[in-house]
């Protein structure tokens, strides 16, 4: 069932997503070649806890980390590890969130470590742009399929492919709520968007074929062909006259997570 939030609940969602976005940007700014993904995860954990939140990924369905940290051909759900070292030229996806006062935030961004090749950079640019194409369609009166169509058509026109097995979702008191928000679809199909809905839109896009495989750890999802993958995500509130990007801080060049405060 789709949960419609009232004004007080929307304020709670804004707070949780502000912290989530600040933590994501903090993590992104501290990525360094030579560090392990476990070290990066610990930085994000400490940031969330310092600001009064709870890392909402940690322990969810048994996931061991504060963030899913996915490198190169890992699409999503990379487990932070002492054994995975970030290297120059990698692309690193961070997907993380915080819970505070009973509400959940969720967001993701894929970062380039130093200089990456032109095709890797194009994948990042297209996937990020596709996120905003989807958000443009996430307005009251439109349907879920309008979002998916916008993401899919933009990415496929650029020569990339869209993961089918994992999708965006509603957010709220639970991290994952109805409705599902696929990154593919048909215009005018699916549930209608109404004010008070809060949804996470998160394109997961592959450089080549969209076929994926899950590792033996039960979490890590990789491209089958070894091509790169990128993942970007914003949590959004559908309002009467516009849509609010609640996790906008991670993509604000003027936002300094070191100065972040919920007070």
Roles of regions detected by a PLM:
Residues 1-263:
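Active-site neighborhoods and metal-handling regions in enzymes and metal-associated proteins
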């Amino acid at each position: 069932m789709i949960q419609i939030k009232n004004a007080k609940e929307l304020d709670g969602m804004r707070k949780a997503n502000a912290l989530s976005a600040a933590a994501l940007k903090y993590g992104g700014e501290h990525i360094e070649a030579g560090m392990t993904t476990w070290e990066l995860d610990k930085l994000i954990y400490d940031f969330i806890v310092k600001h009064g939140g709870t890392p909402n990924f940690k322990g969810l369905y048994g996931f061991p980390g504060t963030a899913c940290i996915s490198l190169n051909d890992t699409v999503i759900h990379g487990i932070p590890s002492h054994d995975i070292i970030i290297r120059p030229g990698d692309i690193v996806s961070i997907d993380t969130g915080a819970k505070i006062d009973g509400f959940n935030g969720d967001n993701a961004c894929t970062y380039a470590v130093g200089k990456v090749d032109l095709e890797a950079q194009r994948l990042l640019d297209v996937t990020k742009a596709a996120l905003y194409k989807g958000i443009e369609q996430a307005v009251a009166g439109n349907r879920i399929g309008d979002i998916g169509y916008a993401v899919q058509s933009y990415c496929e026109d650029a020569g990339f492919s869209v993961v089918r097995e994992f999708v965006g979702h509603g957010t709220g008191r639970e991290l994952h709520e109805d409705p599902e928000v696929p990154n593919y679809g048909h215009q005018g199909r699916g549930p209608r968007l109404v004010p008070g809905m809060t949804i996470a839109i998160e394109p997961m896009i592959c450089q080549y074929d969209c076929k994926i495989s899950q590792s033996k750890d039960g979490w890590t999802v990789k491209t089958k062909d070894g091509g790169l993958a990128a993942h970007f995500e914003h949590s959004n509130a559908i309002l009467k006259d516009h849509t609010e990007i609640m996790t906008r801080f991670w993509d604000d060049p003027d936002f300094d997570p070191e100065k972040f405060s919920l007070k």
